[in-house]
Amino acid sequence: MAVELGVLLVRPRPGTGLGRVMRTLLLVLWLATRGSALYFHIGETEKKCFIEEIPDETMVIGNYRTQLYDKQREEYQPATPGLGMFVEVKDPEDKVILARQYGSEGRFTFTSHTPGEHQICLHSNSTKFSLFAGGMLRVHLDIQVGEHANDYAEIAAKDKLSELQLRVRQLVEQVEQIQKEQNYQRWREERFRQTSESTNQRVLWWSILQTLILVAIGVWQMRHLKSFFEAKKLV
């Protein structure tokens, strides 16, 4: 089963109050759905990778559990404790920020330090166990980004917060996450602008180079034809 996650970005006209309001509303709606729950199948030596766009200084929590296909029952059963998953996370600069072996069910966490596309890869350690024996493994994965990664029930119990205090804390963290998302969108716009300017500059220089090459070829052809006609005494 192939699963593709995407985000639709609507860009209002800049410089208008309505555009700023719409952008804020879109960010709020997007933040409300930043949890990504899915499942996928992997083979014995297969690796699955996912791309998640994450702002900087944002916590990400991934929960997973594995199921092994039982050929006799023809259904997926909970995997044995000996079957583990290796999780590797790379930042947009391709630096490894997490690489660790986990069990058949577990949780991994990391905090982004660079905004952009983070690569999350999982594969099993099944080559060490004959119980897998070329079968298929089903992995249920749930990724929570930003304030959605917080367990507010646990926070309230730990810090002894009232319902009002907890709600205020949730709102504060939501506002902070919105600010991070806005900063990330501005960073993306700046990168896009730089890429566009660089591309336009290259196109301009390539056009100038093509023009110079054509002029040089034209001059060379005229001189060559003149020499040819003079050699044939036609001029």
UniProtKB/Swiss-Prot annotation:
Keywords: Acetylation, Coiled coil, Endoplasmic reticulum, Glycoprotein, Golgi apparatus, Membrane, Protein transport, Signal, Transmembrane, Transmembrane helix, Transport. GO terms for cellular component: COPII-coated ER to Golgi transport vesicle; endoplasmic reticulum; endoplasmic reticulum membrane; endoplasmic reticulum-Golgi intermediate compartment; endoplasmic reticulum-Golgi intermediate compartment membrane; extracellular exosome; Golgi apparatus; Golgi membrane. A motif (COPII vesicle coat-binding) lies at residues 228-229. GO terms for molecular function: syntaxin binding. The keyword Membrane applies. Disulfide bonds: none annotated. Glycans are attached at N125. It is found in: Endoplasmic reticulum membrane; Golgi apparatus, cis-Golgi network membrane; Endoplasmic reticulum-Golgi intermediate compartment membrane; Golgi apparatus, trans-Golgi network membrane. The modification N6-acetyllysine is found at K160. Pfam families: EMP24_GP25L. SMART domains: EMP24_GP25L. InterPro entries: Emp24-like, GOLD_dom. Residues 121-160 are annotated as: Required for interaction with STX17. One of its GO terms (biological process) is positive regulation of organelle organization. Monomer and homodimer in endoplasmic reticulum. Predominantly monomeric and to lesser extent homodimeric in endoplasmic reticulum-Golgi intermediate compartment and cis-Golgi network. Probably oligomerizes with other members of the EMP24/GP25L family such as TMED2, TMED7 and TMED10. Interacts with TMED5. Interacts (via C-terminus) with COPG1; the interaction involves dimeric TMED9. Interacts with PTPN2 and SPAST. Interacts with STX17; the interaction is direct. This is Transmembrane emp24 domain-containing protein 9. It comes from Homo sapiens.
